[in-house]
């Protein structure tokens, strides 16, 4: 009559279509189903037809229908004969409990700080449910109530004095740790009585059979301290409880907002392909015998593409999560190191205090023994100002000295500890600030690096002349100023060296002239007469042109005269002085002397037009005249 397999059956064809039964019911539930059917009223006028419950639905191979099948099974199994026994218009109490508004606030929820244990009893009364599903708080409390109140309803219905049993109901409070990047929660349950804790641990030691992947954590001292405590016998977990909890878990209204984002839209799209229809108007040009195969190929292709995109997004999210985890680990390691150093310092202080106390105790015993044996004068030398003190006064004096020393040491160590604490706090605050600004700094550094790399070639002097003339002038002026300062320093240094070298020579010449003044005077007169007799032959212009002139080898004074001449010629042509043209012309003259005349004229024609040739000729004539 009904399918008895616990898993959905699939029959996959060669075309990529699988046939899935929409529900599956274990054979153990046949009796429940028959009991439900026995309460149904069979109308006599309606024609009876056999129900074809063995139905297979075609779905794509890539589509996972296990969740839908599980939900259908849960809805079927949670039906009870109470629906008929309480009447058509009256719902049972447990169903009314399940219809609580999900927007209500939980009544038993406490802040995590208030649930922290302060003694051994409270520690034993706390159990933890790890990897709890991501439900809203009211749904979490509803699940906990179903678990903890297991068996109480049957006891209340089975006995007349239900009020007394309700008063003895298991009382508890709960809290949770809500992680920032993980959907699963950690639930803390604090019972009011230790016997309830033992009952809960004994009943739900395999809680993962009810709540998948949930781990029950409790104190290991429960077995030691509560082994003699008698509790109510544990109740076996019924299918009804499992189905009630499944209904809560599978109800989308009970789910909290997920923290893992990035591919929910793809999940919805893949789920929508279960009822995806291709419009036949889009396939009007396709032969009828090929339409079914093409529709299957379209659905399979879209599903495959969505699966690939979902995997890629999931990989990206995992990479980002791993980076965040590494940052947090680095931060926690720094905090742990600081905490370990602080604990080590506290242990050292405690050891030193214990040693001081032991030494004080030994010294006190030594003095007491010496006074008892009337040998205090031999074993201890009393300070002169305290020789007249009796035993009580001396003990008070020693105690005051010890306390003063301890206070002094304490203040010194306290100040040192505060200094270290402040330095460590500052370092951690800077580290936190750096981590908070990590994303912003990464983008800023990337932009700065890209801009620097992009402008690397354009920032050279060779390109600044054409691309950014003002910047070129600034750099040239700065460079020229630096060169002039270096030249002045070199001139002063050379002048000082020459003066130091000439001073002894001048002294020698003065001595020599004082001895040979008359012969030198006659010789000077003879040379003057001889020079007047000589006739100077001027050099022809052709001979001057044939001379090889090297500008770099000219003296600094002549080079300055050339620069002044260039400046005057540029001012005559343009009307204003131009430092750029001065540097360009002088550099060309230094590098090529008179060989680069044509290249210099071509370069100056951009600024001076026809005056470029005239300026170059006048400049060359001036340089020849200096040589």
UniProtKB/Swiss-Prot annotation:
Q: Coiled coil located at which positions?
A: 300-442, 469-513
GO terms of biological process kind: mRNA processing; RNA splicing
Bias regions of kind Basic and acidic residues — which residues?
Answer: 337-350, 359-368
Question: Gene3D superfamilies from the xrefs?
Answer: PWI domain (1.20.1390.10)
Query: Where do the record's region annotations for Disordered lie?
Result: 337-368
Identify a single GO molecular function assigned to this protein: RNA binding
Q: Which UniProt keywords apply?
A: Coiled coil, Cytoplasm, mRNA processing, mRNA splicing, Nucleus, Ribonucleoprotein, RNA-binding, Spliceosome
Q: Which Gene Ontology cellular component annotation is one that this UniProt entry carries? A: spliceosomal complex
Ribonucleoprotein among the record's keywords? yes
Extent of the signal sequence = none
- Record flagged with keyword DNA damage: no
Its annotated compartments are: Cytoplasm; Nucleus
Pfam family example for this protein? PWI
Q: Could you say which protein family the record assigns here?
A: Belongs to the SNU71 family.
Subunit structure of this entry? Component of the U1 snRNP particle, a subcomplex of the spliceosome.
Its biological purpose: Component of the U1 snRNP particle, which recognizes and binds the 5'-splice site of pre-mRNA. Together with other non-snRNP factors, U1 snRNP forms the spliceosomal commitment complex, that targets pre-mRNA to the splicing pathway.
Stated name of the protein = U1 small nuclear ribonucleoprotein component SNU71
The encoding gene is SNU71
């Amino acid at each position: 009559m009904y399918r008895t397999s616990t898993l959905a059956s699939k029959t996959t064809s060669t075309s990529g279509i699988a046939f899935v039964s929409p529900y599956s019911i274990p054979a153990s539930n046949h009796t429940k189903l028959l009991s439900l059917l026995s309460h149904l009223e069979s109308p006599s006028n309606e024609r009876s037809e056999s129900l074809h419950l063995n139905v297979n639905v075609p779905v794509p191979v890539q589509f996972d229908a296990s969740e839908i099948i599980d939900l259908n099974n849960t809805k079927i199994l949670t039906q009870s004969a109470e629906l008929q026994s309480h009447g058509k218009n009256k719902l049972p109490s447990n169903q009314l409990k399940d219809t609580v508004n999900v927007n209500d606030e939980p009544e038993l929820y406490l802040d995590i700080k208030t649930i922290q244990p302060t003694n051994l009893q409270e520690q034993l009364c706390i159990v933890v449910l790890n990897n709890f599903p991501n439900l809203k708080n009211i749904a979490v409390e509803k699940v906990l109530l179903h678990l903890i109140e297991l068996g109480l309803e049957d006891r209340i219905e089975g006995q007349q004095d239900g009020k007394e049993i309700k008063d003895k109901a298991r009382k508890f409070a709960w809290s949770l740790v809500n992680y920032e990047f993980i959907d699963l929660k950690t639930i803390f349950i604090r019972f009011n009585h230790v016997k309830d804790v033992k009952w809960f641990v004994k009943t739900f030691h395999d809680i993962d059979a009810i709540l998948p992947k949930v781990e029950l954590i409790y104190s290991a001292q429960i077995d030691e301290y509560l082994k003699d405590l008698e509790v109510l016998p544990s109740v076996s977990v019924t299918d009804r409880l499992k189905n009630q909890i499944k209904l809560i878990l599978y109800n989308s209204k009970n789910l909290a907002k997920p923290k893992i984002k990035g591919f929910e839209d793809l999940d919805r799209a893949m789920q929508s392909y279960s009822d995806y229809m291709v419009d036949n108007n889009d396939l009007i040009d396709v032969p009828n015998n090929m339409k079914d195969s093409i529709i299957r190929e379209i659905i399979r292709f879209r599903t495959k593409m969505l699966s690939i995109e979902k995997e890629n997004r999931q990989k990206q999210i995992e990479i980002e999560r791993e980076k965040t985890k590494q940052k947090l680990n680095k931060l926690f390691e720094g905090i742990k190191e600081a905490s370990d150093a602080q604990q080590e310092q506290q242990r050292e202080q405690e050891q030193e205090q214990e040693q001081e106390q032991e030494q004080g105790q030994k010294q006190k015993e030594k003095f007491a023994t010496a006074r008892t044996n009337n040998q205090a004068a031999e074993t201890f030398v009393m300070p002169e100002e305290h020789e007249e003190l009796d035993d009580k006064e001396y003990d008070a004096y020693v105690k005051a000295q010890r306390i003063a020393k301890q206070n002094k040491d304490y203040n010194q160590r306290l100040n040192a500890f505060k200094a270290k604490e402040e330095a460590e706090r500052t370092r951690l605050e800077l580290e936190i600030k750096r981590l908070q600004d990590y994303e912003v700094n990464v983008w800023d550094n990337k932009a700065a690096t890209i801009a620097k790399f992009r402008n690397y070639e354009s920032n050279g002097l060779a390109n600044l002349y054409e691309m950014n003339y003002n910047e070129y002038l600034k750099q040239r002026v700065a460079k020229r100023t630096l060169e002039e300062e270096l030249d002045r320093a070199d001139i002063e240094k050379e002048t000082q060296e020459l003066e130091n070298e000439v001073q002894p020579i001048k002294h020698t010449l003065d001595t020599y002239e004082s001895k040979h003044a008359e012969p030198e005077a006659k010789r000077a007169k003879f040379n003057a007469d001889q020079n007047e007799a000589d006739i100077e032959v001027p050099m022809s212009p052709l001979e001057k042109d044939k001379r090889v002139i090297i500008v770099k080898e000219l003296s600094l004074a002549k080079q300055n005269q050339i620069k002044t001449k260039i400046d005057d010629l540029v001012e005559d042509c343009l009307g204003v002085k131009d430092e750029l043209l001065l540097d360009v012309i002088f550099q060309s003259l230094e590098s090529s002397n008179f060989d680069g005349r044509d290249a210099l004229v071509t370069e100056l024609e951009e600024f001076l037009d026809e005056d470029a040739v005239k300026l170059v000729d006048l400049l060359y004539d001036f340089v020849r005249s200096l040589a």
